[in-house]
Amino acid sequence: MTAILERRETTSLWARFCEWVTSTENRLYIGWFGCLMIPTLLTATSVFIIAFIAAPPVDIDGIREPVSGSLLYGNNIISGAVVPTSNAIGLHFYPIWEAASLDEWLYNGGPYQLIVCHFFLGICAYMGREWELSFRLGMRPWIAVAYSAPVAAATAVFIIYPIGQGSFSDGMPLGISGTFNFMIVFQAEHNILMHPFHMLGVAGVFGGSLFSAMHGSLVTSSLIRETTENQSANAGYRFGQEEETYNIVAAHGYFGRLIFQYASFNNSRSLHFFLAAWPVIGIWFTALGISTMAFNLNGFNFNQSVLDSQGRVLNTWADIINRANLGMEVMHERNAHNFPLDLA
């Protein structure tokens, strides 16, 4: 009797790690981008939570007037924030080891720069991971393309704008009231409401909300009956079923009669592409607008542009907005300037 011994191939630890990282059988896909995403987002999240709760006040304007942002220093969820890195640091790379002490690093707002840089790497890696998983599953790459819109928006307010203005202190604070302050000061200094790219972003966000509500309500109103009156309509759908769960012809007919025929999509694929593309393109434009205004290419200025036959100014809404801008401008960073307006 001949015994045949089959030699088992031994794979290296690295090969097994590579197989595990790129496996689509895992409950959560890791991927090579995930190897960057997981540590960076964990770091950003951990430091944000600690700083939001316990960070001491930060000298944001570099004039020895610290601004409190954490819960333990008197703030609540609405007023609290991680305060941006000090204007005294500017755009310098400011890790913990660059400061003379931990107290100095905290006083100069080091946590903000740490959070923003790790968060930026993390969301870029998340976008790459979306593409990577789509590639492994043989899907098209448009999920990552759609996600590039919020990535571009975050990059604009956390990275591009501080670079253009010359200091991380001009970045958006990581909190609710801080975000509102950023928006108000941005309007005062750049007149963003009069910038066409911001207008496209507003059309993208509100239009996307409208189209989402229209699509959801049309589909929900044209479901194919599979249940009795006493059952939930949701019970009429079985995950993975091949047949349509709603009547697109009925939805098309309804909307075509409500508006006009060609306002209604008769192709489900082109409809869903439109639903994705509209808000994404709008947010792309807003991010591009923030990035141009970062370098002081600002919104339209129509101030005092309408005169009567005697040469007297007839105020328009543009003039009203300009007066509001001036008021916001002179109120912000009130102790940092020797002049009523920034000279930048």
From Swiss-Prot:
<feature type="binding site" description="axial binding residue">
    <location>
        <position position="118"/>
    </location>
    <ligand>
        <name>chlorophyll a ChlzD1</name>
    </ligand>
</feature>
<keyword id="KW-0934">Plastid</keyword>
<keyword id="KW-0007">Acetylation</keyword>
<feature type="binding site">
    <location>
        <position position="215"/>
    </location>
    <ligand>
        <name>Fe cation</name>
    </ligand>
</feature>
<keyword id="KW-1133">Transmembrane helix</keyword>
<comment type="function">
    <text>Photosystem II (PSII) is a light-driven water:plastoquinone oxidoreductase that uses light energy to abstract electrons from H(2)O, generating O(2) and a proton gradient subsequently used for ATP formation. It consists of a core antenna complex that captures photons, and an electron transfer chain that converts photonic excitation into a charge separation. The D1/D2 (PsbA/PsbD) reaction center heterodimer binds P680, the primary electron donor of PSII as well as several subsequent electron acceptors.</text>
</comment>
<dbReference type="InterPro" id="IPR005867">
    <property type="entry name" value="PSII_D1"/>
</dbReference>
<feature type="binding site">
    <location>
        <position position="170"/>
    </location>
    <ligand>
        <name>[CaMn4O5] cluster</name>
    </ligand>
</feature>
<feature type="binding site">
    <location>
        <position position="342"/>
    </location>
    <ligand>
        <name>[CaMn4O5] cluster</name>
    </ligand>
</feature>
<keyword id="KW-0460">Magnesium</keyword>
<keyword id="KW-0150">Chloroplast</keyword>
<dbReference type="Pfam" id="PF00124">
    <property type="entry name" value="Photo_RC"/>
</dbReference>
<protein>
    <recommendedName>
        <fullName>Photosystem II protein D1</fullName>
        <ecNumber>1.10.3.9</ecNumber>
    </recommendedName>
</protein>
<feature type="binding site">
    <location>
        <position position="332"/>
    </location>
    <ligand>
        <name>[CaMn4O5] cluster</name>
    </ligand>
</feature>
<keyword id="KW-0157">Chromophore</keyword>
<feature type="transmembrane region" description="Helical">
    <location>
        <begin position="142"/>
        <end position="156"/>
    </location>
</feature>
<comment type="subunit">
    <text>PSII is composed of 1 copy each of membrane proteins PsbA, PsbB, PsbC, PsbD, PsbE, PsbF, PsbH, PsbI, PsbJ, PsbK, PsbL, PsbM, PsbT, PsbX, PsbY, PsbZ, Psb30/Ycf12, at least 3 peripheral proteins of the oxygen-evolving complex and a large number of cofactors. It forms dimeric complexes.</text>
</comment>
<dbReference type="GO" id="GO:0016168">
    <property type="term" value="F:chlorophyll binding"/>
</dbReference>
<feature type="binding site">
    <location>
        <begin position="264"/>
        <end position="265"/>
    </location>
    <ligand>
        <name>a quinone</name>
    </ligand>
</feature>
<dbReference type="GO" id="GO:0009772">
    <property type="term" value="P:photosynthetic electron transport in photosystem II"/>
</dbReference>
<dbReference type="GO" id="GO:0045156">
    <property type="term" value="F:electron transporter, transferring electrons within the cyclic electron transport pathway of photosynthesis activity"/>
</dbReference>
<feature type="modified residue" description="Phosphothreonine">
    <location>
        <position position="2"/>
    </location>
</feature>
<feature type="transmembrane region" description="Helical">
    <location>
        <begin position="197"/>
        <end position="218"/>
    </location>
</feature>
<keyword id="KW-0359">Herbicide resistance</keyword>
<dbReference type="InterPro" id="IPR055265">
    <property type="entry name" value="Photo_RC_L/M_CS"/>
</dbReference>
<feature type="site" description="Stabilizes free radical intermediate">
    <location>
        <position position="190"/>
    </location>
</feature>
<keyword id="KW-0597">Phosphoprotein</keyword>
<keyword id="KW-0813">Transport</keyword>
<dbReference type="GO" id="GO:0010242">
    <property type="term" value="F:oxygen evolving activity"/>
</dbReference>
<dbReference type="GO" id="GO:0016682">
    <property type="term" value="F:oxidoreductase activity, acting on diphenols and related substances as donors, oxygen as acceptor"/>
</dbReference>
<keyword id="KW-0106">Calcium</keyword>
<keyword id="KW-0464">Manganese</keyword>
<keyword id="KW-0602">Photosynthesis</keyword>
<dbReference type="InterPro" id="IPR000484">
    <property type="entry name" value="Photo_RC_L/M"/>
</dbReference>
<dbReference type="GO" id="GO:0009535">
    <property type="term" value="C:chloroplast thylakoid membrane"/>
</dbReference>
<feature type="binding site">
    <location>
        <position position="333"/>
    </location>
    <ligand>
        <name>[CaMn4O5] cluster</name>
    </ligand>
</feature>
<feature type="transmembrane region" description="Helical">
    <location>
        <begin position="29"/>
        <end position="46"/>
    </location>
</feature>
<keyword id="KW-0479">Metal-binding</keyword>
<feature type="binding site">
    <location>
        <position position="189"/>
    </location>
    <ligand>
        <name>[CaMn4O5] cluster</name>
    </ligand>
</feature>
<feature type="transmembrane region" description="Helical">
    <location>
        <begin position="118"/>
        <end position="133"/>
    </location>
</feature>
<dbReference type="GO" id="GO:0009635">
    <property type="term" value="P:response to herbicide"/>
</dbReference>
<dbReference type="InterPro" id="IPR036854">
    <property type="entry name" value="Photo_II_D1/D2_sf"/>
</dbReference>
